[in-house]
Protein backbone atom coordinates (compact mmCIF):
# COMPACT_ATOMS: atom_id res chain seq x y z
CA UNK A 1 0.00 0.00 0.00
CA UNK A 2 1.31 3.46 -0.78
CA UNK A 3 2.29 5.46 2.29
CA UNK A 4 1.45 9.17 2.38
CA UNK A 5 3.21 11.57 4.61
CA UNK A 6 1.60 14.29 6.68
CA UNK A 7 2.70 16.96 4.22
CA UNK A 8 0.99 15.13 1.42
CA UNK A 9 -2.22 14.91 3.47
CA UNK A 10 -2.18 18.66 4.15
CA UNK A 11 -1.73 19.47 0.48
CA UNK A 12 -4.56 17.15 -0.49
CA UNK A 13 -6.93 18.70 2.06
CA UNK A 14 -6.03 22.18 0.92
CA UNK A 15 -6.75 21.29 -2.67
CA UNK A 16 -10.13 19.86 -1.76
CA UNK A 17 -11.08 22.98 0.20
CA UNK A 18 -10.21 25.17 -2.73
CA UNK A 19 -12.47 23.12 -4.96
CA UNK A 20 -15.39 23.37 -2.48
CA UNK A 21 -14.98 27.12 -2.20
CA UNK A 22 -15.01 27.51 -5.90
CA UNK A 23 -18.18 25.49 -6.20
CA UNK A 24 -19.85 27.55 -3.46
CA UNK A 25 -18.84 30.76 -5.12
CA UNK A 26 -20.38 29.62 -8.33
CA UNK A 27 -23.58 28.64 -6.55
CA UNK A 28 -23.80 31.94 -4.75
CA UNK A 29 -23.29 33.88 -7.87
CA UNK A 30 -26.08 32.00 -9.53
CA UNK A 31 -28.37 32.62 -6.58
CA UNK A 32 -27.60 36.30 -6.64
CA UNK A 33 -28.59 36.44 -10.20
CA UNK A 34 -31.86 34.70 -9.45
CA UNK A 35 -32.54 37.01 -6.53
CA UNK A 36 -31.95 40.07 -8.59
CA UNK A 37 -34.33 38.79 -11.16
CA UNK A 38 -37.07 37.99 -8.65
CA UNK A 39 -36.64 41.09 -6.47
CA UNK A 40 -38.49 43.21 -8.92
CA UNK A 41 -41.51 40.90 -8.83
CA UNK A 42 -41.66 40.62 -5.06
CA UNK A 43 -41.57 44.35 -4.23
CA UNK A 44 -45.30 44.64 -4.75
CA UNK A 45 -46.27 41.88 -2.29
CA UNK A 46 -43.89 42.83 0.58
CA UNK A 47 -46.32 45.27 2.26
CA UNK A 48 -49.14 42.70 2.44
CA UNK A 49 -46.82 40.06 3.93
CA UNK A 50 -45.59 42.45 6.64
CA UNK A 51 -49.15 43.19 7.92
CA UNK A 52 -50.10 39.53 8.00
CA UNK A 53 -46.86 38.64 9.76
CA UNK A 54 -47.42 41.33 12.40
CA UNK A 55 -50.98 40.20 13.02
CA UNK A 56 -49.89 36.60 13.27
CA UNK A 57 -47.12 37.46 15.70
CA UNK A 58 -49.48 39.59 17.79
CA UNK A 59 -51.92 36.71 18.09
CA UNK A 60 -49.09 34.39 19.02
CA UNK A 61 -47.96 36.80 21.73
CA UNK A 62 -51.49 37.10 23.13
CA UNK A 63 -51.86 33.33 23.17
CA UNK A 64 -48.52 32.98 24.88
CA UNK A 65 -49.50 35.61 27.51
CA UNK A 66 -52.80 33.89 28.22
CA UNK A 67 -50.99 30.58 28.57
CA UNK A 68 -48.49 32.15 30.97
CA UNK A 69 -51.29 33.70 33.03
CA UNK A 70 -53.09 30.37 33.21
CA UNK A 71 -49.92 28.60 34.25
CA UNK A 72 -49.26 31.25 36.92
CA UNK A 73 -52.80 30.89 38.27
CA UNK A 74 -52.48 27.12 38.35
CA UNK A 75 -49.14 27.31 40.13
CA UNK A 76 -50.55 29.78 42.66
CA UNK A 77 -53.54 27.53 43.41
CA UNK A 78 -51.27 24.53 43.70
CA UNK A 79 -48.95 26.39 46.08
CA UNK A 80 -51.92 27.53 48.20
CA UNK A 81 -53.23 23.98 48.44
CA UNK A 82 -49.82 22.65 49.39
CA UNK A 83 -49.39 25.30 52.08
CA UNK A 84 -52.90 24.64 53.38
CA UNK A 85 -52.27 20.91 53.53
CA UNK A 86 -49.01 21.53 55.41
CA UNK A 87 -50.77 23.78 57.94
CA UNK A 88 -53.57 21.22 58.40
CA UNK A 89 -51.04 18.46 58.93
CA UNK A 90 -49.18 20.59 61.51
CA UNK A 91 -52.46 21.38 63.26
CA UNK A 92 -53.33 17.70 63.46
CA UNK A 93 -49.90 17.01 64.95
CA UNK A 94 -50.47 19.73 67.55
CA UNK A 95 -53.91 18.34 68.41
CA UNK A 96 -52.47 14.85 68.70
CA UNK A 97 -49.60 16.19 70.82
CA UNK A 98 -46.83 15.09 68.48
CA UNK A 99 -45.58 18.37 67.02
CA UNK A 100 -42.09 19.36 68.25
CA UNK A 101 -43.12 23.03 68.23
CA UNK A 102 -45.79 22.07 70.79
CA UNK A 103 -43.88 19.46 72.81
CA UNK A 104 -40.85 21.61 73.68
CA UNK A 105 -42.79 24.56 75.22
CA UNK A 106 -45.12 22.05 76.90
CA UNK A 107 -42.18 20.34 78.58
CA UNK A 108 -40.90 23.71 79.80
CA UNK A 109 -44.32 24.63 81.19
CA UNK A 110 -44.65 21.29 82.98
CA UNK A 111 -41.23 21.71 84.55
CA UNK A 112 -42.14 25.21 85.75
CA UNK A 113 -45.42 23.87 87.10
CA UNK A 114 -43.65 21.17 89.11
CA UNK A 115 -41.19 23.69 90.55
CA UNK A 116 -43.94 26.13 91.54
CA UNK A 117 -46.05 23.33 93.01
CA UNK A 118 -43.11 22.22 95.13
CA UNK A 119 -42.44 25.78 96.29
CA UNK A 120 -46.14 26.26 97.13
CA UNK A 121 -46.11 23.06 99.20
CA UNK A 122 -43.05 24.20 101.14
CA UNK A 123 -44.63 27.63 101.70
CA UNK A 124 -47.84 25.97 102.94
CA UNK A 125 -45.92 23.86 105.45
CA UNK A 126 -44.09 26.95 106.70
CA UNK A 127 -47.35 28.88 107.06
CA UNK A 128 -48.94 26.01 109.00
CA UNK A 129 -45.93 25.78 111.28
CA UNK A 130 -46.00 29.55 111.85
CA UNK A 131 -49.71 29.49 112.71
CA UNK A 132 -49.13 26.57 115.06
CA UNK A 133 -46.31 28.41 116.81
CA UNK A 134 -48.47 31.53 117.16
CA UNK A 135 -51.29 29.43 118.61
CA UNK A 136 -48.96 27.82 121.14
CA UNK A 137 -47.55 31.23 122.07
CA UNK A 138 -51.05 32.62 122.59
CA UNK A 139 -52.00 29.64 124.76
CA UNK A 140 -48.84 29.98 126.83
CA UNK A 141 -49.31 33.74 127.20
CA UNK A 142 -52.94 33.25 128.26
CA UNK A 143 -51.95 30.70 130.87
CA UNK A 144 -49.19 32.90 132.23
CA UNK A 145 -51.56 35.88 132.33
CA UNK A 146 -54.15 33.79 134.16
CA UNK A 147 -51.59 32.61 136.70
CA UNK A 148 -50.33 36.15 137.29
CA UNK A 149 -53.88 37.44 137.67
CA UNK A 150 -54.65 34.66 140.15
CA UNK A 151 -51.57 35.51 142.18
CA UNK A 152 -52.39 39.20 142.03
CA UNK A 153 -55.98 38.56 143.11
CA UNK A 154 -54.78 36.35 145.93
CA UNK A 155 -52.35 39.01 147.12
CA UNK A 156 -54.99 41.72 146.84
CA UNK A 157 -57.61 39.78 148.78
CA UNK A 158 -55.05 38.77 151.37
CA UNK A 159 -53.90 42.37 151.76
CA UNK A 160 -57.46 43.64 152.07
CA UNK A 161 -58.31 41.04 154.68
CA UNK A 162 -55.13 41.77 156.61
CA UNK A 163 -55.92 45.47 156.48
CA UNK A 164 -59.44 44.87 157.78
CA UNK A 165 -58.07 42.68 160.55
CA UNK A 166 -55.55 45.37 161.42
CA UNK A 167 -58.23 48.04 161.58
CA UNK A 168 -60.45 45.85 163.72
CA UNK A 169 -57.55 45.18 166.06
CA UNK A 170 -56.81 48.89 166.30
CA UNK A 171 -60.47 49.62 167.00
CA UNK A 172 -60.58 46.85 169.57
CA UNK A 173 -57.60 48.30 171.39
CA UNK A 174 -58.69 51.93 171.13
CA UNK A 175 -62.44 51.68 171.85
CA UNK A 176 -64.26 49.91 174.71
CA UNK A 177 -66.75 47.66 173.05
CA UNK A 178 -69.35 46.33 175.47
CA UNK A 179 -69.82 42.64 175.72
CA UNK A 180 -73.54 42.94 175.19
CA UNK A 181 -73.14 43.08 171.42
CA UNK A 182 -71.10 39.90 171.41
CA UNK A 183 -73.50 38.22 173.84
CA UNK A 184 -76.47 39.19 171.69
CA UNK A 185 -74.70 37.85 168.62
CA UNK A 186 -73.91 34.55 170.34
CA UNK A 187 -77.46 34.21 171.60
CA UNK A 188 -78.85 34.93 168.15
CA UNK A 189 -76.60 32.27 166.67
CA UNK A 190 -77.73 29.75 169.25
CA UNK A 191 -81.37 30.51 168.58
CA UNK A 192 -81.00 29.93 164.86
CA UNK A 193 -82.65 26.82 163.55
CA UNK A 194 -81.83 24.54 160.73
CA UNK A 195 -83.45 25.98 157.56
CA UNK A 196 -84.15 22.46 156.31
CA UNK A 197 -86.12 21.44 159.43
CA UNK A 198 -89.84 20.84 158.88
CA UNK A 199 -90.87 23.01 161.85
CA UNK A 200 -92.30 26.31 160.80
CA UNK A 201 -91.34 29.47 162.60
CA UNK A 202 -94.25 31.25 164.17
CA UNK A 203 -94.63 34.89 163.25
CA UNK A 204 -93.66 37.29 165.98
CA UNK A 205 -96.30 39.82 166.91
CA UNK A 206 -94.78 43.25 167.40
CA UNK A 207 -96.77 46.16 168.71
CA UNK A 208 -95.76 49.65 167.92
CA UNK A 209 -92.92 50.83 165.71
CA UNK A 210 -89.98 48.52 165.16
CA UNK A 211 -86.70 48.45 163.25
CA UNK A 212 -85.57 45.65 160.98
CA UNK A 213 -81.76 45.36 160.77
CA UNK A 214 -80.60 44.19 157.35
CA UNK A 215 -76.92 44.84 157.97
CA UNK A 216 -74.22 42.29 158.55
CA UNK A 217 -72.55 41.96 161.90
CA UNK A 218 -69.29 43.34 160.55
CA UNK A 219 -71.06 46.44 159.18
CA UNK A 220 -72.81 47.00 162.48
CA UNK A 221 -69.49 46.71 164.27
CA UNK A 222 -67.88 49.27 161.96
CA UNK A 223 -70.81 51.68 162.46
CA UNK A 224 -70.56 51.22 166.20
CA UNK A 225 -66.85 51.98 166.07
CA UNK A 226 -67.46 55.15 164.03
CA UNK A 227 -70.10 56.34 166.51
CA UNK A 228 -67.81 55.79 169.44
CA UNK A 229 -65.01 57.70 167.71
CA UNK A 230 -67.34 60.62 167.03
CA UNK A 231 -68.55 60.64 170.61
CA UNK A 232 -64.96 60.63 171.84
CA UNK A 233 -64.09 63.68 169.70
CA UNK A 234 -67.27 65.62 170.63
CA UNK A 235 -66.97 65.10 174.39
CA UNK A 236 -63.33 65.48 175.37
CA UNK A 237 -64.31 66.80 178.84
CA UNK A 238 -65.83 63.50 179.82
CA UNK A 239 -63.84 61.17 181.94
CA UNK A 240 -62.61 58.30 179.88
CA UNK A 241 -63.03 54.91 181.45
CA UNK A 242 -61.41 52.99 178.58
CA UNK A 243 -58.46 50.79 179.46
CA UNK A 244 -55.02 52.00 178.42
CA UNK A 245 -54.39 51.63 174.74
CA UNK A 246 -51.81 49.09 173.76
CA UNK A 247 -50.16 50.39 170.63
CA UNK A 248 -48.60 47.90 168.29
CA UNK A 249 -44.93 48.42 167.82
CA UNK A 250 -43.92 49.01 164.21
CA UNK A 251 -40.70 47.50 163.01
CA UNK A 252 -40.17 50.00 160.20
CA UNK A 253 -40.92 53.66 159.68
CA UNK A 254 -43.25 54.24 156.72
CA UNK A 255 -45.65 57.07 155.85
CA UNK A 256 -46.93 59.08 152.89
CA UNK A 257 -46.66 62.84 152.62
CA UNK A 258 -47.83 64.98 149.68
CA UNK A 259 -47.68 62.18 147.15
CA UNK A 260 -44.33 60.89 148.39
CA UNK A 261 -43.49 57.76 150.35
CA UNK A 262 -41.06 57.77 153.27
CA UNK A 263 -39.61 54.38 154.24
CA UNK A 264 -36.63 53.75 156.54
CA UNK A 265 -35.01 57.12 155.96
CA UNK A 266 -35.49 57.20 152.15
CA UNK A 267 -38.04 59.00 150.00
CA UNK A 268 -39.82 57.41 147.03
CA UNK A 269 -41.83 59.20 144.37
CA UNK A 270 -44.05 58.23 141.47
CA UNK A 271 -42.27 56.73 138.44
CA UNK A 272 -39.28 55.36 140.35
CA UNK A 273 -38.22 51.74 139.94
CA UNK A 274 -38.12 49.81 143.20
CA UNK A 275 -37.30 46.30 144.33
CA UNK A 276 -40.03 44.63 146.42
CA UNK A 277 -38.99 41.90 148.81
CA UNK A 278 -41.44 39.62 150.58
CA UNK A 279 -40.69 36.93 153.09
CA UNK A 280 -40.12 33.47 151.59
CA UNK A 281 -40.35 34.90 148.04
CA UNK A 282 -37.90 36.12 145.45
CA UNK A 283 -37.55 39.91 145.13
CA UNK A 284 -39.28 41.50 142.15
CA UNK A 285 -38.83 44.85 140.44
CA UNK A 286 -41.72 47.27 139.87
CA UNK A 287 -42.48 50.91 139.03
CA UNK A 288 -44.43 53.13 141.43
CA UNK A 289 -47.60 54.45 139.73
CA UNK A 290 -49.66 55.98 142.58
CA UNK A 291 -48.97 56.91 146.23
CA UNK A 292 -52.11 57.35 148.37
CA UNK A 293 -52.57 57.99 152.08
CA UNK A 294 -52.43 54.34 153.17
CA UNK A 295 -51.46 52.40 150.06
CA UNK A 296 -49.00 52.39 147.19
CA UNK A 297 -49.81 51.13 143.68
CA UNK A 298 -47.04 49.73 141.50
CA UNK A 299 -46.74 48.11 138.07
CA UNK A 300 -44.90 44.85 137.46
CA UNK A 301 -42.72 44.14 134.38
CA UNK A 302 -45.46 41.93 132.87
CA UNK A 303 -47.90 44.88 132.90
CA UNK A 304 -50.00 43.79 135.90
CA UNK A 305 -50.76 46.26 138.68
CA UNK A 306 -51.04 45.64 142.42
CA UNK A 307 -51.09 47.66 145.61
CA UNK A 308 -49.07 47.58 148.79
CA UNK A 309 -50.38 48.90 152.11
CA UNK A 310 -48.17 51.17 154.17
CA UNK A 311 -49.08 49.11 157.23
CA UNK A 312 -47.50 46.09 155.59
CA UNK A 313 -44.29 48.06 155.20
CA UNK A 314 -44.47 49.11 158.84
CA UNK A 315 -44.95 45.54 160.03
CA UNK A 316 -42.12 44.25 157.90
CA UNK A 317 -44.24 41.93 155.72
CA UNK A 318 -42.87 43.73 152.69
CA UNK A 319 -39.72 45.75 152.24
CA UNK A 320 -38.71 48.05 149.38
CA UNK A 321 -35.52 49.62 148.19
CA UNK A 322 -34.23 51.56 145.22
CA UNK A 323 -33.20 49.30 142.33
Curated annotation (Swiss-Prot):
Covalent link Glycyl lysine isopeptide (Lys-Gly) (interchain with G-Cter in SUMO2), residues: 240, 246
GO molecular function, one term: histone deacetylase binding
UniProt keyword terms in alphabetical order: Coiled coil, Growth regulation, Isopeptide bond, Nucleus, Phosphoprotein, Repressor, Transcription, Transcription regulation, Ubl conjugation
UniProt xrefs under SMART domains: Sds3
A GO BP annotation: negative regulation of stem cell population maintenance
A Gene Ontology cellular-component term: Sin3-type complex
Ranges in coiled-coil conformation: 52-84, 149-180
Biased composition (Acidic residues): 18-53
Keyword rRNA-binding listed: no
Residues carrying Phosphoserine: 197
One Pfam family in the UniProt entry: Sds3
Function of the molecule: Involved in the histone deacetylase (HDAC1)-dependent transcriptional repression activity. When overexpressed in lung cancer cell line that lacks p53/TP53 expression, inhibits cell growth.
Oligomeric and partner information: Component of the Sin3/HDAC1 corepressor complex at least composed of BRMS1, BRMS1L and ING2/ING1L. Interacts with HDAC and SIN3A.
Family recorded in the similarity comment: Belongs to the BRMS1 family.
Protein name in the entry: Breast cancer metastasis-suppressor 1-like protein
Organism: Homo sapiens (Human)
Amino acid sequence: MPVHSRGDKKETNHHDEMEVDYAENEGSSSEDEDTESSSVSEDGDSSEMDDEDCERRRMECLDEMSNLEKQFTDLKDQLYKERLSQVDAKLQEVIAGKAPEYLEPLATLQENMQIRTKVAGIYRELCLESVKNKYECEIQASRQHCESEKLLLYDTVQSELEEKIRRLEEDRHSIDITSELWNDELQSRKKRKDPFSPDKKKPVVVSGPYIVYMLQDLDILEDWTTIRKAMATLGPHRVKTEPPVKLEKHLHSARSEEGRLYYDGEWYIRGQTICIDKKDECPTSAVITTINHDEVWFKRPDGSKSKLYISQLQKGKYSIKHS
